[in-house]
């Protein structure tokens, strides 16, 4: 099931879930699928121009764009990884792994890590592969590269750490008794101070990055319902981090914020989306499954505004960029909304295929990637 449908994308892990997946996929592709809202004239209140384009192959996995020091690192489904200069769009290096990619990318500016669709963790140094290690399950979350270590989370909810240079496994952490299904979608894995924070089921979990021991758990959503699909509340990337506070979305259940220094839930509010969130010190922004764009007040989670101008357009997770909230859609448009009230400020077109990853800023360039492999750099005048 495509994320670009207004229903959730498919599930993976338990063989018993395949029948459910078929039912849900059929619903998403039926004749009653809502028509994307007409955009109307371009407001053009924000002066933005396209400054470069680049290209990779088709992207059919949950791509996470990584930015380090003015360089954008990305990959395509066939195993090509590229490091692109954010100012010019030119390759700094490009490598073909010879293996299809299932999740990525992770990078600290030197090491780059991806997960292959054959369950391999593959690590490169300066664009050259240095090792690969077979994992026990598929992964859909980009590895985290930090502190000369590579951290991974697989669909069986195992978190593991490897030495970035040698590939030696350092530790692993797993939970028992969690949900039997897992999303075929990027989850949550990031560093906050000296804590590794992972999204496991509906919780943010704080781990010691040196040995994998549990420090705290903070539930953003609790499983509810009578079957495994209804009880699925995995946390989905991207997240919004300001200092020690991390805000995240639980799939089709809630948006909430956690103090990652103390493991304390600050607030959690019902929300019906399946893409991650982004924000600043004042607001947390998210896109709902029907295309609403919502701003929650970061202090208490109360709604500041709701925009319905992009309903059923298959929106990405948002990006806060200056006075704008930026989202991509399934028709290849990049939309700029006012962060204060959601008013449309303008839009840019790409190649007509869906925007497949949340937009990112590379220096003063906004970068987006389409399903057909188009990489576009936009810059405000």
Tell me the role of every PLM-derived stretch:
Residues 30-66, 93-109, 130-146, 169-193, ...:
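Extracytoplasmic beta-rich repeat domains
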Residues 23-26:
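C-terminal motif of bacterial Sec signal peptides marking the signal peptidase cleavage site
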């Amino acid at each position: 099931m495509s994320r670009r449908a207004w229903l959730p994308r498919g599930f993976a892990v338990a063989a018993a879930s395949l029948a459910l997946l078929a039912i849900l996929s059929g619903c998403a592709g039926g004749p009653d699928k809502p028509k994307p809202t007409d955009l109307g004239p371009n407001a053009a209140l924000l002066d933005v121009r396209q400054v470069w384009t680049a290209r990779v192959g088709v992207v059919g996995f949950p791509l996470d764009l990584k930015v380090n020091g003015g360089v954008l690192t990305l990959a395509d489904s066939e195993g090509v990884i590229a490091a692109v200069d954010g100012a010019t769009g030119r390759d700094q290096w490009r490598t073909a792994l010879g293996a299809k990619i299932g999740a990525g990318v992770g990078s600290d500016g030197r090491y780059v890590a991806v997960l292959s669709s054959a369950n391999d963790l593959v690590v490169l140094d300066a664009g050259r592969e240095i090792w690969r290690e077979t994992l026990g399950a598929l992964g859909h979350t980009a590895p985290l590269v930090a502190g000369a270590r590579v951290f991974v989370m697989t669909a069986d909810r195992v978190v593991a750490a490897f030495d970035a240079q040698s590939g030696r496994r350092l530790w692993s952490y797993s939970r028992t008794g969690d949900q039997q299904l897992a999303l075929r979608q990027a989850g949550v894995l990031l560093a906050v101070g000296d804590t590794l924070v992972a999204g496991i089921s509906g919780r943010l979990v704080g781990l010691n990055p040196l040995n994998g021991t549990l420090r705290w758990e903070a539930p953003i959503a609790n499983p509810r319902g009578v079957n495994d699909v209804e009880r699925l509340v995995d946390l989905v990337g991207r997240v919004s981090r300001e200092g020690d506070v991390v805000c995240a979305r639980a799939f089709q259940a809630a948006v909430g914020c956690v103090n990652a220094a103390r493991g304390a839930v600050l607030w959690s509010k019902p929300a019906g989306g399946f893409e991650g969130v982004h924000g600043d010190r004042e607001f947390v922004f998210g896109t709902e499954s029907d295309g609403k764009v919502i701003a929650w007040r970061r202090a208490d989670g109360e709604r500041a505004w709701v925009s319905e101008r992009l309903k059923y357009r298959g929106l990405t997770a948002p990006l806060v960029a200056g006075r704008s909230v930026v989202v991509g859609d399934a028709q290849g448009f990049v939309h700029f909304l006012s962060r204060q009230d959601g008013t449309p400020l303008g839009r840019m077109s790409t190649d007509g295929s869906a925007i497949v990853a949340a937009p990112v800023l590379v220096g003063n360039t906004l970068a987006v990637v389409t399903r057909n492999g188009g990489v576009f750099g936009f810059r405000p005048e």
